[in-house]
Amino acid sequence: LEDLQRGAFVDAYDIPPQAGSTGYDGAKAWEKEPSGTVTDQAGGDVIPLAITEAYQDRNLWWQPDHGGAEIVSAGQKTDGGNTYDVLTVTPKDGKPLEAWFDSKSHLLYRTVEMNSVQKLITTYSDYAAVDGAQIAKKLVIDDGSGNLQTLTLTSAKFSEALPLTAYRKPAEDLHDF
């Protein structure tokens, strides 16, 4: 769930027997753990990371002012025989990341960012048009542990903006497994 105007979001997962979510309402970040415990997330680089995620969700690098981010060319890089235009993007009050764009299609191919002390490499593929926007249907996340996390988008739609209350920290719902 993403608010493309205000940058708020909720990322939820439901992989039985566990479910949880994280969110950012534009000012505060929170996490709902599988136990149902809900906590504010404000330590370390949590808020700058949330700001950077909101920046990416809204594709602000395509705006005339780049959404207020500092953008520096890191040249071209190749991977699998393809060439990518690489930018170092630092959103205002966010964390820097490398964004790799396919030099032919200009679609986002990869992001490289530091999440606290962990380097995350996310690869985007299988783009499809949704209401005129190209959306990656497959994301592969490499956190360096040797295990890859693959996310597959099964449906997407654009709708009217929800009130910011939709992105606020939810109530606790404590339970045992």
Predicted regions and their residues:
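A short, amphipathic edge element
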Residues: 60-74, 118-121
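N-terminal mature ectodomain segment of secretory-pathway/periplasmic proteins
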Residues: 1-37, 67-73, 78, 91
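Short amphipathic beta-strand/extended segments with alternating polar/hydrophobic composition
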Residues: 1-2, 22-26, 39-48, 101, ...
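A general structural signal for short secondary-structure boundary/capping elements
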Residues: 58, 74, 132-135
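Acidic/charged, solvent-exposed loop-and-adjacent secondary-structure segments enriched in E/D, K/R, S/T
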Residues: 30-59
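Gly/Pro-enriched, hydrophobic low-complexity segments
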Residues: 80-173
